[in-house]
Amino acid sequence: MQPWQCLRRFALAWWERTAEGRARSPREEVGPRDPGGRGEPDPERSSPPMLSADDAEYPREYRTLGGGGGGGSGGRRFSNVGLVHTSERRHTVIAAQSLEALSGLQKADADRKRDAFMDHLKSKYPQHALALRGQQDRMREQVGGWTVDPVCLLSSLCSHLHGDSTPSGAGQPAQQPNYWSFKTRSSRHTQGAQPGLADQAAKLSYASAESLETMSEAELPLGFSRMNRFRQSLPLSRSASQTKLRSPGVLFLQFGEETRRVHITHEVSSLDTLHALIAHMFPQKLTMGMLKSPNTAILIKDEARNVFYELEDVRDIQDRSIIKIYRKEPLYAAFPGSHLTNGDLRREMVYASRESSPTRRLNNLSPASHLASSSPPPGLPSGLPSGLPSGSPSRSRLSYAGGRPPSYAGSPVHHAAERLGGAPTGQGVSPSPSAILERRDVKPDEDLAGKAGGMVLVKGEGLYADPYGLLHEGRLSLAAAAETHSHTRARAACTSGVPCALSAPTPLPRCSPTWRTRCTRRALAALYGDGYGFRLPPSSPQKLADVSAPSGGPPPPHSPYSGPPSRGSPVRQSFRKDSGSSSVFAESPGGKARSTGSASTAGAPPSELFPGPGERSLVGFGPPVPAKDTETRERMEAMEKQIASLTGLVQSALLRGSEPETPSEKVEGSNGAATPSAPVCGSGSKSSGATPVSGPPPPSASSTPAGQPTAVSRLQMQLHLRGLQNSASDLRGQLQQLRNVQLQNQESVRALLKPTEADVSMRVSEAARRQEDPLQRQRTLVEEERLRYLNDEELITQQLNDLEKSVEKIQRDVAHNHRLMPGPELEEKALVLKQLGETLTELKAHFPGLQSKMRVVLRVEVEAVKFLKEEPQRLDGLLKRCRGVTDTLAQIRRQVDEGMWPPPNNLLNQSPKKVAAETDFSKGLDFEIPPPSPPLNLHELSGPAEGTPLTPKSTNPTKCLDASSKRNTDKAVSVEAAERDWEEKRAALTQYSAKDINRLLEETQAELLKAIPDLDCASKTHPGPAPTPDHKPPKAPHGQKAAPRTEPSGRRGSDELTVPRYRTEKPSKSPPPPPPRRSFPSSHGLTTTRTGEVVVTSKKDSVFIKKAESEELEVQKPQVKLRRAVSEVVRPASTPPIMASAIKDEDDEERIIAELESGGSSVPPMKVVTPGASRLKAAQGPAGSPDKGKHGKQRTEYMRIQAQQQATKPSKEVSGPNETSSPGSEKPSGSRTSIPVLTSFGARNSSISF
């Protein structure tokens, strides 16, 4: 078409519109029109069966630009799909005057923009400068005072001109269908004579998109379907009195970053009026449906508080109010991939080439917008719908939905139509990025009817290569897939194709029945009866995936609805190659023979497949559900809202990250209802071009007839909903599994970390405790002080060395050279020497303090060393004592058996000798045995004999001897075995020296002599002797200070132990001894030590062993510190670890300091307790004191025993294994003889019971 033709049509169109009157409904649809039938009214323009109930009131006419040669197709009319709310229509009807006023206010600005734009076009297209200039003049004349948006108007012209400059093939631009997705309501009379508006509109988006790259988006209301965004009948007032000029004055409308100032001449009486005004002022961005959507909020500014709040009452709008429109952005707005415009293909199915920028995405709406609602003329083959239903009121969005790629800016579409025999070709639709940005989410607001047609982007770049293709990452509104049942049916009817390449345009492929059936099963086909006529639910990605592959034949090289691939794209080339491939399509609604025509046409379903009332062919979509079907409408609206979010989730889960190669297969697989992906037929809902464009299609499945449209749509809706529910439940299950796995991982990690954490915390706490431990801190401080001391000492030593060397040198010089040294030098040396002496003196004075501190710190180490050194000696001493006690007992038993008692003078003669020996022994033992903690209860252990201690007079010697002899025979064997064991264990121990023995004997003698004056008090029965000064330990022989003895002891009384009780008693804290055994009184020299060993001793050793036994008993009383005066030998610890009480006791510290200062160690006192004296009394309190009566009894018995021993010949050698110990030693005191033995400290009375 030549530029002048385009301009002429343009002018005629506007003239017609102006003449028709201002009150006309603003929703008139400028459908594709037949250039041949330009001025003829279309006989079928108002076919009642295709009108929704909503449209009956305002019939709408759609002119069709049928393909030039396609006989009968030229005059088709499409009834409005009903995409406009009734309220919106009412407002638009009564607001013509307001629109006039608005247009008048902006006329000057519009003229200026128009002139500037025409100049821009002339400079850019000099070859059309003449035509443009003439057209500019004619427009000024024709349009007159009516304000035309110059950008929209002239961009259409520019598009047309640019389209001519592209290879258009056969020069039939008139066949270019009008792809405006906005339905305009026609006046009640026909508009038959509108010249090629559709052609101009179709080209508008492409050419103007390229030519207007420099224009701002705000200034480009491009591609508005009615040529001018200023609606003649803009609804500004709802009230009957439109003459009332109670205007708010000026309003400021803000949307995004744009602000528009509006002069209002009429009162804004309702939200609908405000919506219409906003949609008018932001044509490319907002529509009535969007404004009424819950995703859009209209805010008004509170100047007092400087905040925006939601506008609920239009009466709040006053002069100079600021109204802000906030629209929630869709989740996928940030992704440039192919999305549905706002997720709804139905809304704007516009081509979006990958070269075209968002500002250039003009609304190249496909005829799809008319397919859904149009009822084709009876004579028109149903297989050739002249448009695709993409009918959506969102004109503004479509204007930005992007134009075709520059390569496709011409009118090549018509060639396909020509090939089809004049079938009008429908341009593919692709979502507009800007519109997508406006969507808050999959928006359930607008009709889906046209959507299905819009979804037909199949294999073109719109889907396959176009970044703004259909499915890709966008959230498809169910409507997009809603090319569902109606899509499937429409698919069958959709024959208008868009050639993919200019050189090889291919007609629109029709959908094979199989594809249709699949779509029917899967798509949400419910026709919405929502104030927009009927609408389809927004489709989900699954729907798109299904639509993506028709099963009827080879994949159409270029889906008629898909955006044409760019010139160089392989897709395009493959389309050219494959364009000849044939597919079957139905020629007529009656299901006439399907001509295997040009490649990309797939057969439309014969009308019998979707029989509609009145035999109407389901062009684009089946017969619409009447708007009054409120049940369907409400249900679908509710489901759309619920499913919209699920759709986005499912699609993002299935398609995110899967680029054009596999998304459709994935979606189909997830839906589970799709057959193997087959090339999409005319319905370009191929999701992101999943199937390769040139790939062979899968074999077509047999077509299955679909039921009635309504039933099919409901079935499809249920199936689709079920699929979505399954997908959602699967996703929930996977999410739950992921959560469980994550929880398990966390638990395992915790389990791994727990021991590590415990170990680390233990180490840290241990380190901190060590750091905070007073002993450790003290040790650290002492060590630092010692190092300082050593440094000072080293320095002094160095200085002294230097001084010595210098002095020696001087001395040598004087001796050899005989020269006199100068006095000052000598004085200097003397001064240095004096300083050194002073420093050394200070160092020496400092040493004692350091020494005492180090002693305290090193006490544990010192005692450990002592223990290691002295333990062998102690063991030897214990062994000797055991032997001595054994000898003594053997001698006593012999005396008892023979009835021979030594005279008292023998005992007295022997006692000094023994005492001396014992004293020497105790002096020689260089160890101390800290007693074990709990003092033993002596009364418990002593048994009934304690209460009535017997004196020698009360004992019947004969009875005692008889009982003893009987017991000895019973115990002989065990005693012999124990004796052998003891001998084996102690064989290696060395014997004490005579010096030690003598010292022990002397000490014992001294104690015995001190106790002799108490013999008179033998009648006292309960022993509770208190320590007296006589019993205090003597000072050490060397004169060192002895540690004071302050501890009261329960053992200070008589330490009698009955043999059986003593057998069961165990030392509480002494070094681990062998299991304790009893001392068996025997007349043959056998006895057992405190530690359980049986030894054979001679009479001479008895005193020493008594003392050792007494000491060993003391081991069990750690509270009682047995200290001797300091001696030269290092004192060992009684046990390798020092008792805490011993460490902390001040007396103990003083003793250790004294030991270290003297360089020796304390000689531990030796408490000699014979094994027989091991019987303890429970009644003896811890602080009990020895009883004088008990002392007297014990002394008497001791003197008597000494006399017996002197009478009998004592043998030092063990005679023992032949003799037996008396088993009856456990008998009451009547058969027992007690031998009192005083320890070296005299504070304890020990008795040997047998």
Curated annotation (Swiss-Prot):
Tyrosine-phosphorylated in response to EGF and to cell adhesion to integrin ligands. Expressed predominantly in central nervous system with high levels detected in cortex, cerebellum, midbrain and spinal cord (at protein level). Also expressed in testis and epithelial-rich tissues such as mammary gland, lung and kidney. Residues 365-374, 381-399, 590-607, 701-710 have a biased composition (Low complexity). Keywords: Cell projection, Coiled coil, Cytoplasm, Cytoskeleton, Exocytosis, Methylation, Phosphoprotein, Synapse. Its main location: cytoplasm. Residues 712-753, 793-813 form a coiled coil. Residues 65-75 have a biased composition (Gly residues). Residues 19-45, 437-448, 628-640 have a biased composition (Basic and acidic residues). Residues 552-563, 1069-1078 have a biased composition (Pro residues). Pfam families: AIP3 (PF03915). The modification Phosphothreonine is found at T86, T691, T704, T951. The keyword Cytoplasm applies. GO terms for biological process: exocytosis; negative regulation of cell adhesion; negative regulation of protein tyrosine kinase activity; positive regulation of protein tyrosine kinase activity; regulation of cell migration; regulation of dendritic spine morphogenesis; regulation of synapse assembly; substrate adhesion-dependent cell spreading. The modification Omega-N-methylarginine is found at R397, R404, R567. Interacts with the N-terminal coiled-coil region of SNAP25. Interacts with BCAR1/p130Cas and SRC through its C-terminal domain. Interacts with CSK, CTTN, SORBS3/vinexin, SYP and MAPRE3/EB3. Belongs to the SRCIN1 family. This is SRC kinase signaling inhibitor 1. It comes from Mus musculus. The gene is Srcin1.
